[in-house]
Amino acid sequence: MQLVLSVSGIVLGVVLVGGLSTGYVAPASQPDPVAQTVVQQYVSEVADLGDDEGHHGVWLQSEDGVLAHHQGAVPLPAASLTKVATTLAALQAWGPTHEFVTLVDATGPIQDGVLRGDLVVQGGSDPFFVTEDALILRQSLHALGLKRVLGKLIISGNFFMNFTTDPALSGQLLKHVLSPPPRRAARQWHRTLAPEGQQLTIAGAVEVVSFCPPTRASLVRHRSLALFKLLKRMNVYSNNAMAEMFTAALGGPPQMVRLAALAAGVPTYELHLINGSGLGSENQLSARTICALFAAIHRLVMPARLTVADIFPVAGIDRGTIRHRHLPVYTVVKTGTLRHVATLAGVILTRTHGPVWFALLNQGGNLWGFRTQQDALLQSLVEHWGAADPPPASFIPTSPWADTTRNDILVRVKAGGG
């Protein structure tokens, strides 16, 4: 079986020199024969577990060129490997340290701990505003001395909480944390989460508005996690809601595809994507393109002193969707699963070839069998080439998972206020 891709008589490959460049040029003239044999055996085994060999894709590439390939240029259902494109588009649009800002304002004066007006929350498309953030927000409002809101809780802009994109429901979730309903169980829950004296009462209902009303004072600015940390959380747990929020903030799937293709140096027609999460077999990528997307991510984050391991789960360190996998240690990966699809892509760190980018796309019915074979293939390749020891620093996580306080207390009375 020919494992080096040829399209229209031209041999193609993804340039990953130093892991930095992308695009298509001639690969190494001598693909690794052992890798070719291992891939051939892998394809035969996964075909026995699912669909025939034409429904499986493999691409292995080092900085020197293509090492082995099967159906590498054929778009196949990518499942959550679609999130690799979403990740790249987000990094291209905003940069790895970008923060999404949620503002909390007041429409009236605050006197003796009482806001005589509405509390206004202006969402900024933060995809990871969760209950813990709401609790910290309540603490910040308490630090301002705010104890009671006589008006409503007004939701403006793109405010999401606990992964729901419904602004009304997000507002209700926020109010439930800031000002729990007067039920005994709720009061007990509230006292458990907040020290005595930090309770906040909001008298009015939640109201969602299209345009932010005039406000009198800016109270708190809540900053999201840095984008690279948001993407890490999305990819470790393959969070579909976060992926769709990112895609919406980018302007929708077509714009996401344009940004990802631009950053990776590949044509847009190689990204057959209808959403940002990968839900649906209509989302299709070739194994070759997925490797180009991964390499572009590595290139984009390096100027910020980050690595691709700060963006995706790392075997032996992270859990999430790889908690039951048997991958070579320090392998940086993204998993993908649909009802009849199991995919895996990322980079293994080898002694012989350095970083080797890979993408494996499998279709059929035996998902656990596919995963077992995927893990075994990577273990075989690392055994053949040797594991990088120590692993290169450019592929090791640099940033801790832990969070820091991200609320800025503003207390700024706007012009015309009192």
How would you name each of these model-derived features?
Residues 53-55, 73, 79-82, 97-99, ...:
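Extracytoplasmic
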Residues 103-161, 167-169:
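Active-site-adjacent, His/Asp/Glu-enriched structural segments that form or flank metal-binding
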